[in-house]
């Protein structure tokens, strides 16, 4: 990894993001992994999903169930290990919005604090953080106000972590694509476009 110790794994529903995040955590951390789960068992279907994920993880991994206050919980956990797998950021955003459902400004402030604490914890501890998160910004505009707030807040959270990440992977049909490796900048994009416009040949 680079000087950053954060890895972000993005993907849509059933894209393979959780599986890739888990496999990556095993390759990097082996048995020395703390799995941080943000899901809450609100119904039978979610309870089954949580149990399936639990059975799918290595028995040697420790599990911390933390729907809110993730960064603070990791920082203060006596069980902290060399690699932290957070699955998933999507549900952390959802939990924050549900707690502040009538005050989006408060939800934004809480989420900014959550992300800042996560980054600060990784920077000051000898650990690697793998974060699994959903990419929900490529579909239709949600009909409800809460849906739009969720999309916007998760998009901001993903961008914030990606800016601090050593690598960001986008899962496409189970295939991990290292988007940071093929990323461009505004300066490079403008330069390529000028060349294309002037020569008529794609850069």
Q: What are these model-predicted stretches?
A:
Residues 21, 53, 85, 134, ...:
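Residue-level signal for inorganic ion chemistry
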Residues 33, 84, 167-170:
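Short, well-ordered beta-strand core segments
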Residues 7-77:
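Conserved P-loop
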Residues 1-7:
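Phosphate-binding P-loop
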Residues 59-110:
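Helix-adjacent hinge/juxtasegments
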